Amino acid sequence: MSSNQPRQTWSNRLTYILTVAGATVGFGATWRFPYLVGENGGGAYVFLFCIAMLVIGIPMILVENVIGRRKGVNALDAFGGTMNGKPVAKVWKLVGWMGLHGAFGIMAYYMVLGGWVISYIINIIGGNLDISSPVSGEVTKSFFTEHIENSPWEIAFYTFLFVVVNQWILVKGVIGGIEKAAKYLMPLLFLFLIAMVVRNVTLPGAMEGITFYLKPDFSKITAELFVFVLGQVFFALSLGFGVMITLSSYLDKNENLVQTAVITAITNTLIAVLAGFMIFPSLFSFGVAPNSGPTLVFQSLPIVFSNMWAGPVFAVIFFSLLLIAALTTSLTIYEVLITTIQEKTKIRRAAAITIVLAGIFIFGNIPSILSYGPWKDISVFGKNIFDAFDYISGNILFMLTALGSALFVGFVMKDEAKEELLYKGNHTTVNIWFAYVKYLVPLVILLIFVSNLF
């Protein structure tokens, strides 16, 4: 511990699960998962995603939970101190540093997506995006170009507004702020999600979309696709940038880590699958292509809503759902950096929050916003700044942090890692998990890493 004060713990298992679920759903489940399903064979992708949760998802949740609870400190110091009575080599701190940089990278563009969503909500309510009657793809594309790509100051304002909402919750602390927010926001998210699913699966022609979504076309399943899906699980579960390590550092020592890991994976998968039920039946009902990629939510779905009874109302509900998912995730990613700065420097929490939020807004959010306008000609690795943040954090830093975490558990923590699970676990099961994490998981992560780069 970095403080003489005992560390807070979550009020109960339910609030921890809700907080972790909020950390993992975000845009990964509500935006990224559906468009990747549409691009990669529908049911085939869903089938592989469920397999990937078992192969890499649950084992890696346990890796980060074991590190976090055992060390009980921030995501940087978790890779330091002593283990098994011996000092941990300082080189392991590099794993923590990569995770922190990954957290910065994802927040650099993630908050901007939140700004986009707020823009859609306000413009739909205000009538600037009029979907009260059927519109074409040209209309939604024109709106995206005018109000998202070519309106940097408008998006900067909405992004700043989203940052302020995060700040208002974060100043209340981990338990009083993040936990309490998850306690109310996650049930609201489920309510909105169920309402949208019920509405869309009852549309005429919805069954065609459900079939596309649930019936795997095994001819589309390839080794390359499976490796790709394995990589997406890291994004879906917020693995590799310190979120699970930070959140589990507040876990009670009596909590069953295996059960919480399984529940976390099931909850994330359930929300992602429900998001698909919310989207694909409506796409097929109104003849909109499901494989429109990242623009699916922002350009294709408004066409669907414009053809739907009470479309603007359901559109506002949908984008509000996205905003809630983004908020519950952004709070926990911010917390990774806030906890680290607060514990390393001993400054007040309010000061740490200001440093993190202002720093990311100035050096991450603003460049990401400008990359669609005045800075569109600036490229990093052949990508604009917005996409470069995504690529570097998602394909490089997350993978290397996850690899380092697995190796840290297997070769540094060793018996201490097993002890965290043996209290509530079976010896045989724990030994199998440990061997799997020590030898096989690093190979899987290396395979994903190389595949992402080449």
Feature roles, as predicted:
Residues M1-W31, M60-N65, R69-W97, D252-N256, ...:
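Membrane-interface "cap" regions at the ends of multi-pass membrane proteins
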Residues S2-P6, E179, K183-L327, A351-A352:
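Membrane-embedded translocation segments of transport machinery
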Residues S2-S3, G114-E146, Y250-N254, Q259, ...:
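Helix-loop-helix connectors at the membrane interface of multi-pass transporters/channels
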Residues N4-R7, L36-N40, R70-M98, M111-V171, ...:
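Inter-helical loop and helix-membrane interface segments of multi-pass membrane transporters/permeases
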Residues T9-V20, Y45-L48, A89-F104, A156-F160, ...:
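Select transmembrane alpha-helical segments in multipass membrane proteins
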Residues T15-A52, I245-S248, V258-V262, I266-T269:
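Transmembrane helix-boundary motif of multi-pass solute transporters/channels
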Residues T15-I17, A23, A156-F157, T267-V273, ...:
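Loop-to-transmembrane helix boundary motifs in multi-pass membrane proteins
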Residues V95-L100, K346-L357, A388-I445:
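C-terminal membrane-solvent junction of multi-pass transporters and transport-like membrane proteins
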